A protein has these predicted regions:
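Bacterial N-terminal signal peptides that target proteins for export
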Residues: 1-9
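Short, surface-exposed coil-to-beta transition loops
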Residues: 81-87, 98-100, 113
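Residues at beta-strand starts and edge strands
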Residues: 69, 95-99
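A short, surface-exposed beta-strand/turn
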Residues: 86-96, 122-123
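A mature extracytoplasmic/lumenal domain signature
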Residues: 66, 75-78, 90-91, 101-107, ...
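Bacterial N-terminal signal peptides
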Residues: 9-16
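N-terminal secretory signal peptides
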Residues: 22-81
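C-terminal partner/receptor-binding element of secreted or periplasmic proteins
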Residues: 104-134
Length: 134
């Protein structure tokens, strides 16, 4: 099961740049749910952690924490959602893949809502692919 979850993390990373839109407005939290008070704090902490692999893909900073089955995506300065951090944790239960997502977006509400919608769609496509194949 651990190997499949790691494969899912790699798979999520491969889809990070083919985002699409959905209609539902995202729910908002009153405080950060990513474990850090700010996007900058999260990025600095993850970059300092030797167990986490950090790479830049198409301007996005991607931090992969295989031990905790977590993939972080940080928007580039060129993106309307900058600065933002998307934290996704992959779980497998009863042969079903689940993605738990938390977002901290410090940009405008419309840009943040759009970012969340894009990642929700991405997560849905990834889950469908992992359940049913390409």
């Amino acid at each position: 099961m651990k190997q499949r979850a790691l494969t899912v993390i790699a798979f999520i990373g491969s889809f990070a740049w083919s985002l699409a839109f959905s209609q539902a407005p995202p729910q908002e939290a009153k405080q950060s749910t990513i474990g850090y008070a700010s996007v900058a704090e999260a990025l600095v902490a993850l970059q300092a952690n030797r167990k986490i692999q950090v790479a830049v893909q198409n301007g996005w900073t991607i931090a992969t924490d295989q031990e905790n089955k977590t993939l972080w995506s940080f928007s580039p300065k060129s993106d309307p959602s900058y600065p933002s951090a998307v934290k996704r944790i992959v779980e497998e239960r009863n042969d079903t893949v689940f993605v738990h997502m938390d977002v901290l977006c410090e940009a405008s509400k419309p840009a943040c809502d759009n970012l969340v919608r894009q990642f929700q769609q991405l997560n849905e496509r990834m889950q469908q692919h992992m359940q049913h194949g390409p």
